[in-house]
Structure formats: C-alpha cells, structure tokens
C-alpha cells in the first residue's frame, strides 16, 4: 500500500518512522521548507525531513498546496492509496484531499471534538482536563471536523507539562496510525464515525502575552498555565525589568497580596495569588538557563514583600 506522508515537527517524525518500520511503501514525504532557527538563525531542516532523508525517502517542501498546480500534479503522479498527515502546518485544499484513493488520515492530539485547532495539548492542560488523547481522523475541508477512525485516551497526570504530554501522545499517535493503516490494508476500508455536535471547543494558537502570569488569578489556574506553556511560550513574570520564565511550581495554602513575594529560600520562591500561593521550584532568568530554585537562591535572593 502506497502512503504519502505529510508532517513537520518531532511529533510527525515519530509517526513517519513508525509507518516506515511497519513496511508500508512511502513514495513521497511532504514537509515545510527549511527555516532559520536558533540564536545563529541557521537554516535548519524540519525533523520530518531529517527522518525522511535518513530513511532514504523522497522529500518535497512546497511553500503551499492551495492553488499549486505543480504540487497537485506531483501528488497525482504518485498514485497513493492514502495520505497520513501529522502537524504539517499547511492547509490541504479539497483537490489535495481528493487525490489519494482512501483520502487523508490526520493524527490529532486531542479527543475530538474537544480542542480542535492549533494547540490542543496546551489547552487541555490549561483547562484542567483529566484526560486527553489522540484521534485518527478522516480529513475533510473543515478545521479538524472529519470523521474519527480511532480514539486513544491518555490520563493527564497532576504534574504533566505540555512537553511530557506531547511525548506520550507522539508515541500513541504513531502506533495508532500504523494500526489503522494495517486495517485499511487488510480490509480495504476504515470504519469512521462522525464527531458529536456537542462538546466542540477550539484550541487557539498560543501567544507570549497570554503566558504572562496574572497573579490575581488563583494559584491552581496559574499552576496549570505554567505546565501548559512549558516549554513554549513559557509562563513568565517581569523581574528587574526583564522577563523571567517560570518552569515549575506547586500550589501552597498561604495568603497575601496578589504578586507579593512571601518567602525566597532553597525550598522555593513563594508568591501570593488571588487564591492561595505558588511555590516556584524551577525558573529561568532572562538570558540564562533553566535552574532549580536551590541554584537560583544560592546566588541571589528576592526580598520578601517584593511585588512581581
């Protein structure tokens, strides 16, 4: 069975490797163009391109697929049975969705219809959801509105960051899409069900500004945001005129004026919130590396009563 693969980041690269390891023929891999990255802004290939080249696969990097006759013709020439799409980052117009014999399967990191859109992992943690998961979806022209082929659940742990949930769902998604491709190969079809009309939510793209901590919110809400925005865009506060990223914290039953530093020691930096307080245990000063509060407190202190 011929499988076109379209994806860009690590989440997608894991699925590509799994599909290849399962023995499916992959005549074409699509990924986004190389982009400048890092402090040196060096042109860097996306993880899917790196994985494809290691696997000896053909890689193409069109800037867009909409109104791109050359790309459309390229896809048609492959005569693929199905396309697997994972965090590709480009819109697939209907004429592209129609090319593969069995359409396009998307690996989506939420339990649809909850958290359609760009940042489902982060929004699930931020909202305090007890669980999330992966859906393999038959793509249509809407935003994550297609019929669901399979659903795979993951219980969000109280300390899970977005990065940790991402890594768990990456493995789940890779295994899930392989299983569905194997079913398609053996039975010639997939049993997809329509998404419920109730319970639809949208996972808006993250912004640096919303990651700024508002100490008037409850400690529980802020703690979830810290985990949801870890590693990027990273929850932050302004300290000495510069942004300081907060990487890990826990809720403690202390009271004070919102934003007031209640204590600063090797045990933690405790800051009052609208309800209860946060004990910060890991942070990242502007221009510096991530560090434990023990390392931070060894070289400096934040005076009790300081308002962040």
Curated annotation (Swiss-Prot):
EC number: 2.1.2.9
Transmembrane segments: none
Amino acids binding (6S)-5,6,7,8-tetrahydrofolate: 110-113
This protein's GO CC annotations: cytosol
Residue ranges that the Swiss-Prot or TrEMBL entry lists as coiled coil: none
EC category: transferase
Entry superkingdom: Bacteria
UniProt-listed Pfam families: Formyl_trans_C, Formyl_trans_N
Function: Attaches a formyl group to the free amino group of methionyl-tRNA(fMet). The formyl group appears to play a dual role in the initiator identity of N-formylmethionyl-tRNA by promoting its recognition by IF2 and preventing the misappropriation of this tRNA by the elongation apparatus.
Record-given protein name: Methionyl-tRNA formyltransferase
